[in-house]
Amino acid sequence: MNRWQRSVVEIQTRKRQVNECERAQVALSKVTACFQQMSTSLGSNVDGSFLREEMEETRTVAHKICSGLHRRLLSLLMEIDQGQEDKEQVERLWVIFLSSLENFQQDLKKVKVLQEIFPLTQRKDRQALVITGLAGGTSEVAARAAMVQTPWLSVEVTVSPDLKTHIEEIDVLLEEMLQRVNVPLWSVEPTQEAWVEGSSTPGVGQEEDESLEEMMEVEVVSQNKTSGCCHHHNCKVGCLLCLLS
């Protein structure tokens, strides 16, 4: 294999690894979101051993994804030279992964505190649960987390630590990531504008207000004549009063 062929193979291998990391980051976001949603039921009337087993399984999946993603991103950042086209993409994944780890660690700390307040080690412990009015369970959320797959989840086996050790491991992981790789957080630029779905062009809001007033317009039929009520453009309160009258 000559130098050109070796270079092509290296580029293809690196792109494949970057794509795997992107898919893993998406998977991690889904799993941690499910874990966070399930944690909101701790201490409520739907809490129980089944919920905590589901959370433990979800935490195990998140730990496997984090371990594999950390190793691959670290390897990529230490191998990629300055100026390579994949460098910005990998650095962006690195920053997103840092943020995801910090958020996940905060959720783990909250879960640890709630499990200490509501231990559920004995039958009488259920008397301390708060009746929040929630119905059903979190099996659907746990099923979504269980369906999440990563490119290396089936071939790499890692032992998931207990909750306390997991929190401590993330501290060590974050410190290692910040020390071994010099990626200034402020130097990483986003690929899309923030709150794109919430932005609007000038004039859109005014058109929406006008259409709302048209929908709220109340027609009064009297003596075979139709007249509009509250036609003034600032008469929103009057429209509501007309509807309530």
UniProtKB/Swiss-Prot annotation:
Belongs to the RGS7BP/RGS9BP family. GO terms for cellular component: neuron projection. Regulator of G protein-coupled receptor (GPCR) signaling. Probably acts by regulating the activity of some 'R7' family protein (RGS6, RGS7, RGS9 and/or RGS11). It comes from Danio rerio (Zebrafish). The lineage of its organism: Eukaryota, Metazoa, Chordata, Craniata, Vertebrata. This is Regulator of G-protein signaling 9-binding protein. It comes from the Eukaryota. GO terms for biological process: G protein-coupled receptor signaling pathway; negative regulation of signal transduction. The keyword Coiled coil applies. Keywords: Coiled coil, Signal transduction inhibitor. Residues 71-92 form a coiled coil.
